Amino acid sequence: MNNALTVSRRGFGLGAAAFGLLLVSGCSRGSSSEGGGLGSGSGKLTLAYNSDGPHKTWAEAVCHSVSNVLGITMEPLPVAQFSEMRSAITKHTLLGAFRSGWSADYPSLENFLNATFQTGASANDSQYSSKTFDDLLDKAAGSADPQTAYGYFRQAQSQLFADLPGIPLWYQNGFGGYSRHASNVDFNWTATPVYEEARSSANGGVVLANLSEPQNSLLPTNTNEANGGRVLDLVFAGLIRYDKDGNVINEVASSIETTDNQHYTITLKPGWTFSDGSPVTADSFIKAWKFGALLSNAQLGSSFFERIKGFSYDEDSELTGLTKVDDLTFTVELNAPASDFKISLGHYAYYPMPDSAFKDPKAYGAKPVGNGPYRLVSWDHDSRIVLEPNPAYAGGRTVANKGITFKLYTSLDSVYNDLLADAIDIADGVPDSILPIFQKQLGERAINKPAAFYQGLAIDVTHEHWKMDEEGRARRAAICRAIDRKLICDKLYYGTRTPAKDFTAPTVVGWTADVPGNEVLTYDPDEARRLWARAEAISTF
């Protein structure tokens, strides 16, 4: 299932919406200058996790691994709600570290690294700041060719391994299965089923799939969780789209040209219309982006427009970087070069909207009119969402079914039971209790594929014992070396997780496991104890 998360304008990144959190603390409650934060002291590490998610088992396993290796006490600390954990993170009252991670918004190494570790980034919860790291990201952003950018990203990750403001744990696969009625089912680079390609021999050819109730209206600029996003990706089409492997393909755009990664000219293909017959023009994008960026509109996806000139987090301001040339052409000026800007334009925050959206955004969000391969027929809250093929769709995705009906669930156990009974055609997850057996139960109908999803520990580097000094680096490296990732992935997750080699994900173009310094991810009890002893010689934990 996809855990929904509502965030503020400067809030948690979209890609992290599915994650629980954990805390490692060496400070007593109320001690030091940080004040009364979460965690326990007297040399004990607390591993906090949100107990409204499936995190208890792995948290216990990590505690056990670290405690055994370092000879210290590390205990799980359940926190009732994800929102409570999130509040403590944003207020920086966690006395140590917490689990974090990233699920890619779009297939770019830059999306992982900028969002989570660049100085001042909205999801930089460790409060990490490194001029060397930031400069390498800037060089990558200004690179004229992808290979040069990949080289800078590799160097940037090497700096992260030297500092360890975060500790990568594992990559998560997309896993699930399909019914005896279904065929041609596959998952893409984000572990999302490729719904339009799926077929069903039942239900009149309509494919039944699981989803959870979207947490917000289905307005592209106001959606920040996976459930609503999946519907939007079927009802709308953007300037570009991503194929199953994350490669970029022009969709509504005929061309997106730049000579400096800062100034872009975007030309649209003629003939595109929304499902109500109104034309898709340059204004459809310009108006939608300006609406999404305006502070007073309080759109949850507003941060996607922060790179465009004129954006402000503090007051209403026009996106002056958007200029209409003619009905099929507009230009974009960014505040600074961004080599992944074109890649980002396939995200649903950048989808076009017709004029009707701005006349009554609330009504539009309840039943959006899009330009994608499907149109929304009905949304029966907490029950189902019905989509039918859109005959006006002019893009490159082939619809192989008679429609998609999302059944809205609150439990993966119910999803899996319905899958076994052929009551749904596609399930995009299974309960943790079924992980050891689902591939055997489903046989060739089981799916288990890598996804653009990484999990790790994020360390607040401003807190005592964890700062950006010799002691803090040694402690983080000791913990990193003390976690037996392979054992946890094998024994708890049965091949649905893979030990991490970096801070991104293998399904993203440009990924490499050859990053200098990533040997610190190797389980090495002796080296872990040596590093912890070095930190203890500086300051007793």
Question: What residues fall within each predicted segment?
Answer:
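Periplasmic-binding protein-like
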Residues: 57-58, 157-170, 468-509, 524
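Ligand-site clamp/hinge motif
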Residues: 359-365, 392-437, 452
